[in-house]
Amino acid sequence: MKVIIGLGNIGKEYEKTRHNAGFIAIDLLLEKYNYSSVKQEFNSLIYTTIINNQKVLLVKPLTFMNNSGLAVRQIINFYKINLNDLIIIHDDKDLNISRIQFKKDGSSAGHNGIKSIINNLQTQNFYRLRIGVNQVPKEWKIVDWVLSKFSDEELNLLKQSFIDKIEFINDFTNNKTFIYLMNKYN
């Protein structure tokens, strides 16, 4: 089984915000791959689909960004997921909006959702798909920037950039190595 978790904040007021890039990515995956069921458990919405004869959980934590690790830990523990079978999708303020990058390991780089996951899993050793949301303008505070809404042009660019790389899920479910994914899609 593979698990792909997109980070974001719940609620209408957070839709289309930079911090919800992970939720936007999960929505794009749900549009492409039919899901057989959805349930709310482990502080998350969990969508189940089959890709390449592999069960895949597409997940949106309902804990708000700063507590994402709680939901991730509950899912990992319940389903006994190997961390090599997990990808966390999140926004990255250090990447341009059209940039999507795979990463393994490393610090949170100030991202509170990733920090929560590291604290709850007690490791930095998990795969990430970073979605660029543009650098914080000098006159903005970081929190205000990541909670600001994308312009229509930015949102379309973000979605198209993700769609251009959406086939990563086929390689991931075919058990390609993460180094292969980084070399092919970064």
Swiss-Prot record:
What Gene Ontology terms describe where this protein resides (cellular component)?
cytoplasm
Q: Where does tRNA bind?
A: 14, 64, 66, 112
Q: Where in the cell is it found?
A: Cytoplasm
Recorded GO molecular functions are:
peptidyl-tRNA hydrolase activity; tRNA binding
What InterPro entries does the entry give? Pept_tRNA_hydro (IPR001328), Pept_tRNA_hydro_CS (IPR018171), Pept_tRNA_hydro_sf (IPR036416)
Question: Does the UniProt entry include the keyword Hydrolase?
Answer: yes
Where in the chain is the site Stabilizes the basic form of H active site to accept a proton? 91
Q: Where is this site: Discriminates between blocked and unblocked aminoacyl-tRNA?
A: 9
Name the Pfam families for this protein.
Pept_tRNA_hydro (PF01195)
Which residues are catalytic?
19
User: What EC number(s) has UniProt assigned to this enzyme?
Assistant: 3.1.1.29
Biological process terms from the Gene Ontology for this record are:
protein quality control for misfolded or incompletely synthesized proteins; rescue of stalled ribosome
Catalysed reaction per UniProt?
A: an N-acyl-L-alpha-aminoacyl-tRNA + H2O = an N-acyl-L-amino acid + a tRNA + H(+)
* The UniProt record lists the keyword tRNA-binding: yes
**Major subcellular location class:** cytoplasm
**UniProt keyword annotations, A-Z:** Cytoplasm, Hydrolase, RNA-binding, tRNA-binding
Judging by the UniProt lineage, the source's domain of life is Bacteria
Known function: Hydrolyzes ribosome-free peptidyl-tRNAs (with 1 or more amino acids incorporated), which drop off the ribosome during protein synthesis, or as a result of ribosome stalling.
How is the subunit organization of this protein annotated in UniProt?
Monomer.
Q: Which HAMAP family match?
A: Pept_tRNA_hydro_bact
Q: Please state which protein family the record places this protein in.
A: Belongs to the PTH family.
* Name of this chain's protein: Peptidyl-tRNA hydrolase
Organism of origin is Mycoplasma mycoides subsp. mycoides SC (strain CCUG 32753 / NCTC 10114 / PG1)
